């Protein structure tokens, strides 16, 4: 596979791990899978990811930034998503999605977007549920194990890694801005700007020792 016609170099795609899936797959995602490794890990087709990413950015560019809502609850996506919103002007919800945001006019942060952009259809299930309820199209980053029945536009990708999600948000932001004529070949932001936001995230680990003897097995009768 050459770099010709790709949105970035093949080396950049591979280094980001954008093609690394999981050890589960669904029939919905089968068409985007390139192969399965000896360890059972499914590998996504980079060229198909590039193609869908390009088309997704083109689709989103039909909408004004204020008419798009981009959502994520994934820890490593929060920083890159905020950067995505900063450079594009697109509305973002990074972190908990408050129930009723799209369906309850009395909600404090009620919004009426025309399209929803998700980082993960399973993790962002509340936002997806409400988008379905109000009937707006949904663009979603989907890994090999996802069900996609309610995703109108699938972007097959590793949506869990710091590097991969940073690259996705960077490329979509860049192409969205280009398609709308807001930037030219000189891009005022970089992949590293997005990656920096992801790398600064520190995940708290639960180091408390487990309490033994709290739960006891009942004798069989």
UniProtKB/Swiss-Prot annotation:
Keywords associated with the record: Ribonucleoprotein, Ribosomal protein
GO term, biological process aspect, one: translation
Matching Pfam families: Ribosomal_S2
GO cellular component, one term: small ribosomal subunit
GO MF assignments: structural constituent of ribosome
InterPro entries reported for this sequence: Ribosomal_uS2, Ribosomal_uS2_arc, Ribosomal_uS2_CS, Ribosomal_uS2_euk/arc, Ribosomal_uS2_flav_dom_sf
Stated family: Belongs to the universal ribosomal protein uS2 family.
Protein name in the entry: Small ribosomal subunit protein uS2
Gene expressing this chain: rps2
């Amino acid at each position: 596979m050459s770099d010709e016609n790709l949105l970035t170099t093949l080396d950049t795609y591979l280094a980001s791990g954008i093609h690394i899936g999981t050890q589960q797959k669904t029939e919905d995602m089968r068409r985007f899978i390139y192969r399965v490794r000896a360890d059972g890990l499914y590998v996504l087709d980079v060229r198909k990811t590039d193609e869908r990413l390009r088309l997704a950015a083109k689709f989103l560019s039909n909408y004004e930034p204020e008419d798009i809502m981009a959502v994520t609850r994934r820890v490593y996506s929060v920083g890159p998503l905020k950067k995505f919103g900063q450079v594009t002007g697109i509305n973002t919800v990074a972190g908990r999605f408050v129930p009723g945001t799209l369906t309850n006019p009395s909600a404090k942060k009620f919004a009426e977007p025309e399209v929803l952009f998700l980082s993960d259809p399973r993790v962002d299930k509340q936002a997806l549920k409400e988008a379905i309820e109000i009937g707006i199209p949904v663009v979603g980053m989907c890994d090999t194990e996802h069900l996609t029945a309610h995703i109108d536009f699938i972007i097959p990708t590793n949506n869990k890694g710091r590097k991969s999600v940073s690259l996705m948000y960077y490329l979509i932001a860049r192409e969205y801005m280009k398609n709308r004529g807001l930037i030219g070949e000189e891009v005022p932001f970089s992949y590293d700007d997005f990656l920096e936001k992801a790398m600064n995230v520190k995940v708290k680990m639960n180091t408390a020792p487990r309490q033994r003897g709290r739960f006891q097995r009942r004798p069989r009768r």
